[in-house]
């Protein structure tokens, strides 16, 4: 426990909290244009071809975003919405594309967990 004299000389310093998603600039989502759509491989011990895209955001940031779900319709110059959320086995991927918003279509034939993949309720 510090004495009052010590605290007067050198006060306590608050820890600075660093954002995990700096490109969003405290917004829930951001819009951007795809500059490159490609696949990449995850870290060990996983193995796959993960679909990702490089995006130039409206605020000038250039980020890599993961495209979730089976199949997508994105190509260069597609306008997409991104949200925060990293992909644990892809280094440098800190954002997700929002399916079913702007140019990114929802996942075809999706029946469960539809809201996460931009799919409307099917007709009964």
From Swiss-Prot:
- What InterPro entries would the database entry show? NA-bd_OB-fold, Ribosomal_uS12, Ribosomal_uS12_bac
List every position bearing 3-methylthioaspartic acid: 89
UniProt KW keywords: Methylation, Ribonucleoprotein, Ribosomal protein, RNA-binding, rRNA-binding, tRNA-binding
Got a GO cellular component term for this one? small ribosomal subunit
User: What's this chain's function?
Assistant: With S4 and S5 plays an important role in translational accuracy. Interacts with and stabilizes bases of the 16S rRNA that are involved in tRNA selection in the A site and with the mRNA backbone. Located at the interface of the 30S and 50S subunits, it traverses the body of the 30S subunit contacting proteins on the other side and probably holding the rRNA structure together. The combined cluster of proteins S8, S12 and S17 appears to hold together the shoulder and platform of the 30S subunit.
Q: Which family does it belong to?
A: Belongs to the universal ribosomal protein uS12 family.
HAMAP family assigned to the protein according to its UniProt record, in alphabetical order: Ribosomal_uS12_B (MF_00403_B)
The protein's name is: Small ribosomal subunit protein uS12
Species for this entry: Haemophilus ducreyi (strain 35000HP / ATCC 700724)
